[in-house]
Amino acid sequence: MSKPLILVTNDDGISAPGIRSLIAVMQEIGTVVVVAPDSPQSAMGHAITINSTLHLNKISAENAAVTEYSCSGTPVDCVKLAVNEILKQKPDLCVSGVNHGSNSSINVIYSGTMSAAVEAGIEGIPAIGFSLLDYDWNADFETFKPYIKKIALEVLQKGLPDSVVLNVNFPKRKEEDLKGIKICRQAKAMWEEKFDKRKTPQGKDYYWLTGEFVNHDKGEDTDEWALQNGYISVVPVQFDMTAHHAIQALNNWDLNK
């Protein structure tokens, strides 16, 4: 029986510790091809490159166990190039991450990590985005390798519903403090942005984005609650953004009179 073909990408860049851990786990499962940004692309969302050239650089040796490419574009560019130019086929699974920092709640909208997974889902590829609630470059990814493998194998064996990808977030906890895996909904939270106004040496104004993450949702079925209480959160994310519950109300508007 042939091994599954697995595409690995991220938004922190191809040299980030998180993706190196993810590659190691995927090697235990299947044949791995890596296409990841050549520099950090955090918070790029679903951006694609249309007004400049894209460059791929094969960085793995010909006989290497894992085929690796760095890409000058965004995480979504990486997935598009991988499927259409490198693999020339759909892989059995696409995994993105492991991100340095949480992508729970509203962060899923801004996340390059999750946008890469969503792009794979749009292409009809089962996909998972993994993130760790720890921004330290030397964060402990080893603790979560067994959970990454478990979730990836479940997706490979059972598949995912149409137009759905998984958003998996790990709490910053030691192994003995983890309470398990919890299927959740996305918490209703947001960033309250502020801009730090500064001046260049030439006296021109510029701005530095700051802010505070505010969780207005106290539900115990949310990803934020799960992470704060020692659970690994798994949220099924859909990329059909239609607000189906609002269609009937809008049909009652007098738009055709």
From Swiss-Prot:
Query: Where does the protein end up?
Result: Cytoplasm
**Disulfide connectivity?**
none
Q: How is the cofactor bound?
A: Binds 1 divalent metal cation per subunit.
Please give the InterPro entries that the UniProt record associates with this protein: SurE, SurE-like_Pase/nucleotidase, SurE-like_sf
Q: Which cofactor does it need?
A: a divalent metal cation
User: Which SUPFAM superfamilies does this UniProt record tie to the protein?
Assistant: SurE-like
Q: What is its EC number?
A: 3.1.3.5
Q: Name one GO cellular component term.
A: cytoplasm
Kindly state which keywords UniProt assigns to this record, in alphabetical order. Cytoplasm, Hydrolase, Metal-binding, Nucleotide-binding
Specify where it is mainly localized: cytoplasm
| Protein residues bound to a divalent metal cation | D11, D12, S42, N99
Q: Catalysed reaction(s)? A: a ribonucleoside 5'-phosphate + H2O = a ribonucleoside + phosphate
HAMAP family reported in the protein's UniProt record: SurE (MF_00060)
Q: Which family does it belong to?
A: Belongs to the SurE nucleotidase family.
Its function, per the record, reads:
Nucleotidase that shows phosphatase activity on nucleoside 5'-monophosphates.
Q: What is this protein called?
A: 5'-nucleotidase SurE
Its gene?
surE
